[in-house]
Amino acid sequence: MARILALDYGTKRTGVAVTDELKMIASGLTTVQTPELIKFLEDYFKNEKVERVLVGEPKRMDDTPSQSEVHIQEFLKEFVKKFPEMPMERVDERFTSKMAVQSMIDGGLKKKKRRDKALVDEISATIILQTWLYE
């Protein structure tokens, strides 16, 4: 069975989350340096069956795109060119970073660990994936 992959795209780092094969549980996978993201996806797609990729869509409260959308659009063009057969969807990612930090607090992580932006990105990708699964 194939998995679903979610990306919390950032200009420096991208958080990656994946479902189990039954598509019931979302788990953080890793955080990738964004310039290495396409190579990471190539390798991952060779080793794992992936049914679709979800990419976070950052929006402002008035539903207009955030400033980072310009960079995401550049990535999406490259993604579609490199992986034309892979279905891709956008998922509203408003507040995922705040939710990620709150989940770290609720989980009892020390302040030093909560400052780990790579971990925040990975948890944010997991929240994006969970949001999609529960819709």
From Swiss-Prot:
Subcellular location: Cytoplasm
Enzyme Commission number(s) of this protein: 3.1.-.-
Signal peptide bounds: none
Enzyme class, spelled out: hydrolase
Molecular function terms, GO-annotated: nuclease activity
GO biological process: rRNA 5'-end processing
CC terms in the record's Gene Ontology section: cytosol
SMART domains: YqgFc
Coarse class of the protein's main subcellular location: cytoplasm
Keyword field: Cytoplasm, Hydrolase, Nuclease, Ribosome biogenesis
Function of the protein: Could be a nuclease involved in processing of the 5'-end of pre-16S rRNA.
Record-stated family: Belongs to the YqgF nuclease family.
Protein name: Putative pre-16S rRNA nuclease
